[in-house]
Amino acid sequence: MIIDWKAHILPGLDRKCDSHVKAIQLMIYAKRAGVDKLVAMPFYEAGTDLRQFIEMRDEAFASVRGLVGEDMPELMLGTEFKYDKQILDTDGVELLKETPVLLVDFGGKLPSDEELKALRDYFGDRLMVSDADTLSDEDKLRLTGLGFQSVVDLSEIRHSKDIKKLLPFVESGFVRGFGGDKLAGRDPYRHLEKTKRRMGEGFEKLCKKLC
C-alpha cells in the first residue's frame, strides 16, 4: 500500500487546491500513480482561530469525501502545524487532538526534551514529524528515543542511494512514510510515477517496509 501523508486536496484551505475540480484531478493523478490512500493535510497557522480552522477543515473534507468514487484513493483527515510553545494552551487544542493524523514542523530546530515529551504525551501516536529531512541524524535519534515517527518528503527520494540512506531510520521505526509537500506543478504525483519506474524493485521493497 502506498500512502501520501501530505495530500493538499482541500479547496479553501490548501493553496495548491483552489477548487473541487482540482481536488478530483489530484485524486485521479494519485490513483494513476499507484497511491492507495491520501491523508488530507491542511496547514494550521499558529495564532489564528483554531476552532474556526477545524470547522472549515471538517466542512472542506466532507465536501471532498463526497466526491470520491470507487476508482479513487481512500481518504483520511489530517492537519499539519508548526511547533509553537503555546500550542498545547491554544483554545480548541482538544479538537485538534481528535484529528486522526497530525504532522508537526519544527522548523529545522528541535525544542527541549521536556517540550518534546509534553507534545508526544498529549497527542500520542497520531503525531508525526514533517520536517525530518532538515534535521541532523543526532536529532532524528533524539526523536526516535522519545517515540516520535516521521514522514519524509517524496522529493528527497530520487536515487537508490537515497533509499539506502533512509533504511536505518525505516528499520528503527522513525520513518513511517512519505508525502509530496515540496512537489510542484499540475500533477505532483508525476515524480512518484518516475521514481517507481526508475527504482523498480527497490522502491517496492521500501514501500513494504513502510506499510
Which residues are covered by each model-predicted region?
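An N-terminally biased module of ancient metal coordination in phosphate/nucleic-acid-related enzymes
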Residues: 1-72, 141
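Acidic side chains
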Residues: 4, 14-18, 105, 176, ...
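A conditional alpha-helix N-cap/helix-loop micro-motif detector
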Residues: 19-20, 112, 159
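Generic enzyme active-site microenvironment
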Residues: 4, 40, 78, 103, ...
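Active-site beta-loop-alpha junctions enriched in small/polar residues
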Residues: 8-10, 43, 78-84, 107-109, ...
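Extended substrate/RNA-proximal surfaces in nucleic-acid metabolism proteins
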Residues: 50-150
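A structural alpha-helix within SAM-dependent methyltransferase catalytic domains
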Residues: 24-31, 120, 124, 144, ...
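Charged catalytic cores and adjacent phosphate/nucleic-acid-binding surfaces used
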Residues: 135-211
